[in-house]
Amino acid sequence: GDVGTYNGGDCIMTGVNAVTLGGSLYWVDMVGNRTAPVIFGPRRVVLLAGRNKIVDTQADAERRVQQIAGPKNVARHTGFRTPCAVTGLCADCNSPQRICNSRVWLERCYPAGRILVLLIDEEAGL
């Protein structure tokens, strides 16, 4: 299941769609409710990622979200009729229900140490 998002003001805890072996973090988001506070906001950010989200390269991260996480995520939303919800395959659609409106890469954080990534040694999240 989804880890959800906790925003306690000074700290936010949420997930990430992919983590590369080089340490890059990647999200795809519908409205930016997860990505915006990670980039700027709370003094502390805790990110949870299961081993299923670890990929070799940035291209692998994008492919993972497009082929696995995106279609599975939109399928959980009843009433969404995007191409990926219907077929299970991303069609880079133009639907108003599109969940991949924001694509965010994070290479580093400022100030250093503000973001903590906790890797979970099991399949966790989409």
Task: Identify the role of each PLM range.
Residues 6-126:
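Conserved phosphate- and dinucleotide-binding cores of soluble alpha/beta proteins
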Residues 1:
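Active-site cofactor/substrate anionic-group-binding motifs, chiefly glycine-
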